[in-house]
């Protein structure tokens, strides 16, 4: 019987940190208002030209390295995100192409917190 497992974990976050105080310049809000309602103090923003697929590909490569596996042993790619680079193709297809494993299944799950 085949069993699924998570052999490695990877993540990728943008370098740019945007604090609540920076948002005060663009909208009628305050650090206190945001923190009291969401608990959020800062967030990461990508630079122009960087897409969800760039972060997903970087995270995938880190997970593959951690797992110490050949990407060709992967059977399925699932990407969970509410943001995509394009309406079509999905981010999973871009990850699949970047990893060079085009003969397997890949799909996106639209999800947010």
Which role does the model predict for each range below?
Residues 48, 106-113:
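Active-site nucleophile and cofactor-binding loops and adjacent substrate-binding regions
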Residues 7-10, 80, 110:
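Short beta-strand segments
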Residues 72, 86-89, 103-106:
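Short, flexible active-site-proximal loops enriched in glycine and acidic residues
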Residues 75-81:
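Short glycine-rich or small-residue beta-strand-to-loop segments that form or flank ligand, phosphate
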Residues 83, 87-97:
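Short Gly/Thr/Asp-enriched flexible loops that form oxyanion-binding sites at enzyme active sites
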Residues 52, 56, 88-91, 112:
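Conserved donor sugar-nucleotide recognition element shared by glycan-biosynthetic enzymes
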């Amino acid at each position: 019987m085949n069993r699924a497992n998570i052999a490695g974990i990877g993540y990728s976050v943008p370098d740019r940190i945007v604090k609540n105080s920076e948002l005060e310049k663009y909208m009628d809000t305050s650090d206190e208002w945001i923190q009291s309602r969401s608990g959020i103090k800062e967030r990461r923003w990508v630079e122009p030209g960087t897409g969800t697929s760039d972060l997903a590909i970087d995270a995938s490569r880190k997970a593959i390295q951690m797992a110490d596996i050949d990407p060709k042993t992967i059977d399925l790619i699932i990407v969970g995100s509410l943001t995509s680079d394009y309406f079509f193709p999905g981010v999973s297809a871009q990850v699949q192409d970047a990893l060079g494993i085009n003969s397997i299944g890949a799909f996106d799950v639209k999800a947010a917190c």
